[in-house]
């Protein structure tokens, strides 16, 4: 499905679910017959006989998805399970069709977490260290740079090298399916958790910085692959059903464009 199609489907599910619920509450004695004439989805059903719209949407989004073609499988390997609630992890990974990941691993470390480590080592205030580090990392995405210029940014990228490579690999996969997991106390579509979507902005920021470092060091092909990966990831994320997923997709695509311009303006890039 296209982003527009998925968004329309999600809106239909949300409105359909709300309408059905309103009807039930306004006239609890009136039972609606579940059929294609009354609702797009006719199954699965909840114990009370209502259509389980979240499960229906999840089934639709997961059609044809396997652990081998799903970008989310590699993205979770890159970022780790930390943003997935502990009580939801078994269900999340079961729906992905892969074993659950351990809490601790060689996962991508974000800018703030890395800056906090620097502050702890130096004894400086974390706010001062993080502000300077964020500025350097942002500049490192805007132009070619050397390891001597931004040595701490280079060290973070080196530490995250394998995780970033997983993000690149994920971008090459043709499908994007992140299981719809809801809070049991609030089983509504609006309460579906999005544990992987926001983390991709962190991955793209670091990939664009790595691309500019590769460009400065003469690896124009590797730099271009990192940038293309950002755009491919945005396309994959656009398959997400939610408005948040669509907005993050637009944001990471836009983040990569600035680095694209720096790449194309560089003397290291030739017509060949």
Regions found by a protein language model. Give the residues of each.
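N-terminal Sec-pathway targeting helices
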Residues: 1-11
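Aromatic-rich surface patch/π-platform used for binding flat ligands and interfaces
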Residues: 20-272
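Hydrophobic alpha-helical membrane-insertion segments, chiefly the h-region
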Residues: 10-21
């Amino acid at each position: 499905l296209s982003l527009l199609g998925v968004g329309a489907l999600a809106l239909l599910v949300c409105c359909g679910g709300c309408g059905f619920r309103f009807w039930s509450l306004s006239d609890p004695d009136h039972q609606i017959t579940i059929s294609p004439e009354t609702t797009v989805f006719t199954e699965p059903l909840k114990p009370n006989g209502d259509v389980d719209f979240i499960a229906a949407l999840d089934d639709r989004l997961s059609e044809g998805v396997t652990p081998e073609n799903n970008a989310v499988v590699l993205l979770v390997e890159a970022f780790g399970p930390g943003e997935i609630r502990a009580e939801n992890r078994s269900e999340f990974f079961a729906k992905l069709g892969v074993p659950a990941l351990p809490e601790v691993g060689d996962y991508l470390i974000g800018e703030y977490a890395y800056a906090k480590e620097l502050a702890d080592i130096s004894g400086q205030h974390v706010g001062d260290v993080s502000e300077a580090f964020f500025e350097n990392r942002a500049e490192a995405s805007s132009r070619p740079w050397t390891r001597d210029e931004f040595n701490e940014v280079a060290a973070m990228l080196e530490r995250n090298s394998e995780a970033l490579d997983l993000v690149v690999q994920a971008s090459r996969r043709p499908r994007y399916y992140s299981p719809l997991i809801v809070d049991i106390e609030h089983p509504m579509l609006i309460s579906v958790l999005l544990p992987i979507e926001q983390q991709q902005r962190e991955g793209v920021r670091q990939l664009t910085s790595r691309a500019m470092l590769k460009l400065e060091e003469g690896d124009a092909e590797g730099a271009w692959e990192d940038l293309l990966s950002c755009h491919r990831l945005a396309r994959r994320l656009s398959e997400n059903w939610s408005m948040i997923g669509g907005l993050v997709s637009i944001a990471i695509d836009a983040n990569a464009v600035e680095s694209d311009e720096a790449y194309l303006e560089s003397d290291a890039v030739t017509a060949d």
